[in-house]
C-alpha cells in the first residue's frame, strides 16, 4: 500500500479522537506467526484483515477498513446502528469493475461480494468470528475468507459507509468514501468525486 494513502486514512479517523492500529504484515509474522504468502495482484493486507477478531481476543467490536478510505464523519456512528451480527458490511451490488487494473498495477477483478470486506465491523464475541483463527487465516482459500463462507449472520449498513468513488453517484454527503481504483495522488484520479476531502488531509 502507499504510505501517503495510509496516512490520509489514519488522519481522517484520528481527528475524531479514535485510535488506529495498522495491520503490518512483518509485525504479524514476527509476533503472531502469520505466514501467508501474498498472491500476485494482492496487497499485504488482503488476508491480514481477517485476523482482527483473533488480535482482539475475540472480544468487543472492531472496525476494519482499507487504507484508501477517507472518513468524512465520525466512524463511531456505526456503533449506534450495528446490530449483533457476526460481521456488518456494505453489501455492494456492483457487477463489474471500472478498470482492469488499479493503482500499483494491482489486478482489478470482479467476484461475488467484491468490496464487502473492504469495510467490516466485526462482532468479535460472536461464535462465527471464532472460525477466524490464525491457522484459518493462514491456510483457508481466498473465497472462504472474502466471500464470507465462514459466516451466515452478515449484517448490512447502507452505501454511505463505503461509498465507492467512480461507481456510485447518488450520495452527496457519505460518511466514508473509498477510492478503490486509485486515490487522488494519481493523475488519473485527481479529479474524482470527493478528491478535495482526500487532499485536505494530505
Where are each of the predicted segments found?
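Short, solvent-exposed polar/charged micro-motifs at secondary-structure junctions
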Residues: 29-36, 98-101, 165-169
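Extracellular/periplasmic catalytic domains that process cell-envelope and extracellular macromolecules
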Residues: 112-114, 169-170
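A glycosyltransferase accessory/donor-loop signature
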Residues: 2-3, 7-8, 15-17, 22-29, ...
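GT-A fold catalytic core of metal-dependent nucleotide-sugar glycosyltransferases
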Residues: 48-97, 121, 128
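Short, P/G- and charge-enriched loop/turn segments at secondary-structure junctions
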Residues: 38-41, 104-109
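Flexible, glycine-rich active-site loops centered on histidine and acidic residues
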Residues: 21, 100-103
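Active-site-proximal specificity loops/subdomain of glycosyltransferases
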Residues: 21-56
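A gly/proline- and charged-residue-enriched helix-loop-helix capping module
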Residues: 89-101, 108, 116
